[in-house]
From Swiss-Prot:
Similarity-based family: Belongs to the class-I aminoacyl-tRNA synthetase family. MshC subfamily.
Organism expressing this protein natively: Mycobacterium tuberculosis (strain ATCC 25618 / H37Rv)
Protein name: L-cysteine:1D-myo-inositol 2-amino-2-deoxy-alpha-D-glucopyranoside ligase
Encoding gene per record: mshC
PANTHER family: CYSTEINE--TRNA LIGASE, CYTOPLASMIC, CYSTEINYL-TRNA SYNTHETASE
Catalytic activity: 1D-myo-inositol 2-amino-2-deoxy-alpha-D-glucopyranoside + L-cysteine + ATP = 1D-myo-inositol 2-(L-cysteinylamino)-2-deoxy-alpha-D-glucopyranoside + AMP + diphosphate + H(+)
Length: 414
């Protein structure tokens, strides 16, 4: 599937330190050590509604990683999926009386516009689940063949769905570190079906949902139906990149069940101990002290902000003001502060000269390499900007160097 426009990324002189990121599986910050080509898989949207700031914060986070790898001289193979086979999409299409494919196409187009406006670098492979059915079927066949999957007995219900055995890998649970009770609760809350009759274990995850009347379905050797959520990402990642990813990423709400099962699906057929070397998760974004949710009706949409002539660079800078792993709140104050900061940065970098900037660029690189510490990086830049505006300087190349660093590393257009 076509992604979005890729803005040019300027090249800074020199190199920054090695990137270190918090790994959700190991529960610690440690170095990310990609090979000749870095690999990253980030879970994409379910295209049934417009992009809100929670989505934006996640993709801006992984855009920082993308930019830091480029700054380190790495090539990158970045894959992102589109979950265009999922119940929320079908339910929204039914509610609105539109074809689910048309709804998905419209929302994907809007998402791409939002990402381009926020200057998020696109993935090399942008893959809809509907484009990878054959890969999913092949992966399910392998899981059935090795005993990691089973078909629900016909005596237990009309539909012979296929499930993945949660105990198919000895290491199941390492990615989240959650206990069984927490896993069961989150399965119930996040699209699982622990109470489904006929399952070997309540935690077992759906791989193939046999066709039901009125639901979209695709042909397969085990009958018409559609894939489960987790196998979509496992199949797309394995077919586009292979096992042993440098990073699997997404929002913190994907730690379990989605990323745990995606990893287990891949590991049971690849034989790898870990699907990814790093599991990286971004925190959630709330609005004015409340969780942002459709039920509350308090979603802040990127497209709505753009329609109000809010500058996307200010939105991006506002999201970067907090640490990526922290759950945090968006507010008018956050936006106002980001807008004012953007104006100050533009004023300073437009000066004919300023204080020497080599040190501040080195500090920005160092802070970002330390688990994407954007608050410290922004504070360092604020310090240089204050000195430039209030005291001036004699380095004619400094303003341009700072502007280039802000563009290349933070993705903010001045």
């Amino acid at each position: 599937m076509q992604s979005w426009y890729c803005p040019p990324v300027p090249v800074l002189p020199g190199r920054g330190p090695q990137l270190r990121l918090y790994d959700s599986a190991d529960r610690q910050v440690r170095p990310v050590a990609p090979g000749s080509k870095a690999t990253m898989y980030v879970c994409g949207i379910t295209p049934y509604d417009a992009t809100h700031l929670g989505h934006a914060a996640t993709y801006v986070t992984f855009d920082l990683i993308h930019r830091l790898w480029l700054d380190l001289g790495h090539e990158l193979h970045y894959v992102q999926n589109i979950t265009d086979i999922d119940d929320p999409l079908f339910e929204r299409a039914d509610r609105d009386g539109v074809d689910w494919r048309d709804l998905a196409q419209a929302e994907v187009a809007l998402f791409c516009e939002d990402m381009a406006a926020l200057r998020v670098l696109p993935p090399q492979d942008y893959v809809g689940a509907t484009e990878a059915i054959a890969e999913m079927v092949e992966l399910i066949e392998k899981m059935l063949a090795c005993g990691a999957a089973y078909v629900i007995d016909r005596e237990m219900g009309e539909y012979q769905d296929i499930y993945f055995r949660a105990d198919a890998t000895l290491q199941f649970g390492y990615e989240s570190g959650y206990d069984r009770d927490t896993m069961l609760r989150l399965c119930e809350e996040r699209g699982g079906d622990p109470r489904r009759p006929g399952k070997s274990d309540e935690l077992d995850a759906l791989l193939w949902r046999a066709a039901r009347p009125g639901e979209p379905s695709w042909p397969s050797p085990f009958g018409p139906g559609r894939p489960g959520w987790h196998v979509e990402c496992a199949a797309i990642a394995l077919s586009r990149i292979g096992s042993g990813l440098d990073i699997q990423g997404g929002g913190s709400d994907l730690i379990f069940p989605h990323h745990e099962f995606t990893a287990a699906h891949a590991e049971c057929v690849s034989g790898e101990r870990r699907f990814a070397r790093h599991y990286v998760h971004a925190g959630m974004i709330g609005w004015d002290g409340h969780k942002m949710s459709k039920s509350r009706g308090n979603l802040v949409l990127v497209s709505a902000l753009r329609a109000q002539d809010v500058e996307p660079s200010a939105v991006r800078l506002g999201l970067l003001a907090g640490h990526y792993r922290a759950d945090r709140f968006w507010s008018q104050q956050v936006l106002d502060e980001a807008t004012a900061r953007l104006h100050r940065w533009r004023t300073a970098t437009a000066l004919p000269a300023g204080p020497a900037a080599v040190d501040v660029v080195a500090r920005v690189r160092r802070y970002l390499a330390d688990d994407l510490d954007t608050p410290k990086a922004i504070a360092a830049l604020d310090g240089w900007v204050t000195d430039a505006v209030e005291y001036g300087g004699h380095d004619a190349g400094a303003p341009k160097l700072v502007a280039t660093a802000i563009d290349a590393l933070l993705g903010v257009d001045l």
